[in-house]
């Protein structure tokens, strides 16, 4: 009997998928039954190898060894997760497994996590893609009823791989360069360094801020209000106020319009993080971790997204 190997991003997600599909046979590192083998990645099982993997000359941080530009990129299995990788590799190469389903999170990072394992394991079997944004049983079953060809997501993987390689090239080379020049470890990153620059600029602006007094002239027109723009000169503001007090306001035009205010859109990850920080003081990572945990408990739709819309299927369940 041909089996379908399903690989989720985390054990908890694998267990949820197994429950939805009625798969109950727990094994060491996977769940088996009903024509399925369901296993998991435990996050980033495989990553791009460190610089030393490309030659002993890169083991020490030296200026004359820079830049480090791999011609053929290598993968490295997280040493703390080697057992689970070995399990996945063995499952992928089982003779009775006919295809492998990528059930990692429906996003760029989920695609990368699966593909790195798939490629590092040397798997050549057909790939299918489970693309769902809800962990409800109905959404899972519907997703398996309409699995996509894994190669349809090659562009998404290319995007994730490009990001990973850019992080590696900038992080490895720039960190070594500036650390050697500075004499101490000075971490440089594609995202963290520009972000640090923004924080530095903001801190400098606050430090050099000069208080400036300004004035507004406000009119109360029996139900309607009007205000001038900022006026820095007190005498000018007083003159405008005096001129208004000696004249009669006349309404020369009145337009009435009916407007419909649309309800606010649902949260995407960025707006959720911003609001959680404003109300609760949570960091971006705290919000993401909490949202991910709620998603895995089927209380939120998939949080790692920049979309503020629901699928028709998600709407039904919500």
Q: Language-model segments: what does each one mean?
A:
Residues 1-164, 168:
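Intrinsically disordered, low-complexity regulatory segments
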Residues 37, 45-78, 90, 183-292, ...:
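Long, highly charged, low-complexity internal segments
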Residues 126, 196, 300:
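Conserved ATP-binding/catalytic motifs of P-loop helicase motor domains
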Residues 159-189:
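Amphipathic alpha-helical segments of the small helical/lid subdomains adjacent to P-loop NTPase cores
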Residues 296-303:
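A short, conserved structural fragment
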Residues 304-308:
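Short, Lys/Arg-rich nucleic-acid/phosphate-binding segment
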Residues 311-314:
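Short, basic-rich loop-to-helix N-cap that marks the start of a DNA-contacting helix
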Residues 316-318:
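Conserved small/polar residues in nucleotide/adenosyl-binding loops
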């Amino acid at each position: 009997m041909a089996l379908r190997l399903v690989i989720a991003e985390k054990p908890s997600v694998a267990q949820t998928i197994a429950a939805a599909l009625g798969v109950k046979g727990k094994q060491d590192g996977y769940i088996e039954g009903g024509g399925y083998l369901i296993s998991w990645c435990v996050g980033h099982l495989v990553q791009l190898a460190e610089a030393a993997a490309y030659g002993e000359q890169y083991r020490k941080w030296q200026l004359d060894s820079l830049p480090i530009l791999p011609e053929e990129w290598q993968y490295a299995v997280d040493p703390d997760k080697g057992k689970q990788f070995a399990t996945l590799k063995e499952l992928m190469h089982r003779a009775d497994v006919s295809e492998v389903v990528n059930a990692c999170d429906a996003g760029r990072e989920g695609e990368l996590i699966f593909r790195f394992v798939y490629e590092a394991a040397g798997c050549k079997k057909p790939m299918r893609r489970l693309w769902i944004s809800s962990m409800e049983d109905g959404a899972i079953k519907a997703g398996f009823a309409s699995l996509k060809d894994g190669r349809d997501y090659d562009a998404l993987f290319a995007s994730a791989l490009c990001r990973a390689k850019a992080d590696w090239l900038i992080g490895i080379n720039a960190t070594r360069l500036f650390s050697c020049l500075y004499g101490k470890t000075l971490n440089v990153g594609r995202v963290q360094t520009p972000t640090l620059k923004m924080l530095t600029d903001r801190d400098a602006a606050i430090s050099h801020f000069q208080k400036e007094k300004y004035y507004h002239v406000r009119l109360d027109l029996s139900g309607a209000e009007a205000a001038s723009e900022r006026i820095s000169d007190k005498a000018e503001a007083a003159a405008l106020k005096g001129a208004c007090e000696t004249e009669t306001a006349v309404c020369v035009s009145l337009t009435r319009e009916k407007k419909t205010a649309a309800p606010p859109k649902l949260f995407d990850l960025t707006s959720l993080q911003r609001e959680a920080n404003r109300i609760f003081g949570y960091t971006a990572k705290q919000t993401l971790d909490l949202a991910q945990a709620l998603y895995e408990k089927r209380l939120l739709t998939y949080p790692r997204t920049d979309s503020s819309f629901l699928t028709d299927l998600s709407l039904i369940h919500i």
